[in-house]
UniProtKB/Swiss-Prot annotation:
GO cellular component, one term: hemoglobin complex
Family: Belongs to the globin family.
Residues holding heme b: H63, H92
Protein name: Hemoglobin subunit beta-1
This protein's encoding gene: HBB1
Protein's GO biological process: hydrogen peroxide catabolic process
InterPro entries: Globin, Globin-like_sf, Globin/Proto, Hemoglobin_b, Hemoglobin_oxygen_transport
Subunit structure and binding partners: There are three forms of hemoglobin in Sphenodon: A, A' and D. Hb A is a tetramer of two alpha-A and two beta-1, Hb A' is a tetramer of two alpha-a and two beta-2, Hb D is a tetramer of two alpha-D and two beta-2.
Length: 146
C-alpha cells in the first residue's frame, strides 16, 4: 500500500485528537451491538444482554482501547503493516478462529465513531485516509488465513 504525504499528515493530525480508550470502547461496543454474532468471541466479558449493558461493560471498553491502540501502532508502521500485525493475525486465525469479515466490520465502525466525534475535522479526504487504513489493517490481520 502506498501512502501519500497528505494521507500520512491527515492520519497523524487527526489521531492526535483521538481519545483511544473512549473511541476504542465505543467502536467495539458498536460492533457487538450492530453485529451480535461477534459476541461469541467475547462470551467471558460478562453481561452482553443489551446495547446499554454492552456499551457500559468495562471489559468491552478495555478491550476496545487495546484494539484501538493497535490502530495507533499501524500509524507508526504504515509501510510494514503485515509484519506489524503478524502475531495478531496468527492469534485470530489459529486460536480464536475469527472470520476475517469481522475485521472489515470493525474498521467500518471505527470510521463511524471517528466521524461522529471529529465532526468537521473528519473531511472526505480524512475519511478516505482512515478507510484506507482500516482496510489495510483488516488485510494485514487476514494474512495468516491465506
Amino acid at each position: 500500500v502506498h501512502w501519500t504525504a497528505e494521507e500520512k499528515h491527515l492520519l497523524g493530525s487527526l489521531w492526535a485528537k483521538v481519545d483511544v480508550a473512549d473511541i476504542g470502547g465505543e467502536a467495539l461496543g458498536r460492533l457487538l451491538v450492530v453485529y451480535p454474532w461477534t459476541q461469541r468471541f467475547f462470551a467471558d466479558f460478562g453481561n452482553l444482554s443489551s446495547a446499554t449493558a454492552i456499551c457500559g461493560n468495562p471489559r468491552v471498553k478495555a478491550h476496545g482501547k487495546k484494539v484501538f491502540t493497535m490502530f495507533g501502532e499501524a500509524l507508526k508502521h504504515l509501510d510494514n503493516l503485515k509484519e506489524t500485525f503478524a502475531s495478531l493475525s496468527e492469534l485470530h486465525c489459529d486460536k480464536l478462529h475469527v472470520d476475517t469479515e469481522n475485521f472489515k466490520l470493525l474498521g467500518n465502525l471505527v470510521i463511524v465513531v471517528l466521524a461522529a466525534r471529529l465532526h468537521d475535522s473528519f473531511t472526505p479526504a480524512a475519511q478516505a485516509a482512515f478507510h484506507k487504513l482500516a482496510y489495510s489493517v483488516a488485510h494485514a490481520l487476514a494474512r495468516r488465513y491465506h
